[in-house]
Amino acid sequence: MASPTKPGTIEAPPAINSLSATQWTRPDYQLPVPSLQFLFHLECDMEDFHHIGQGPFGNRSTVIFKGGRFEGPRMRGTILPGGGDWEIVQDHDDIQTAHLNTRYNLQTHDGAIIYIQTTGTRTGKRSVLEKLGEDKSITPDQFRMRLNLTLESGDPRYSWVNDGVFIASSGRSGTQVIYDAYQVL
């Protein structure tokens, strides 16, 4: 198994030379390696945890967001109350994976509303993840939480978010979700 890429770096694809030229139509076609541009830092306050229980896809919970804040070079503002996370948790031996699915609204400092939806996973040792809501000493390097973000706005000042590709590195501390979002360029 290959070693993981060092955090903060992007691994370029290897040259295609393991197969004969007849198996590839364009082995010389060089695609650009994407880069990341910081979008914002976000801290979301959670409340009202509803444990629905074990269902056909895993252990489902709903978490309601009461608000929060975000700030970056191109936008800043607050998280409006009422959004939430509809997550499914699955246990595999001593590893736990939460499949995250959030929806909420951001309000920018200049009055625009941006709808945001995230999907992703939070995975790590079950003994660590089961303490996330209670133990603030757990650090982001003890588990992995990554998100894919979709942003939408009808405000012309933020129409650029409608066509963007966004990802985030995330974590949890007590009743907060914290993440740094990036635009993939």
Regions found by a protein language model. Give the residues of each.
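Beta-strand-enriched cores of mature, soluble protein domains
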Residues: 2-185
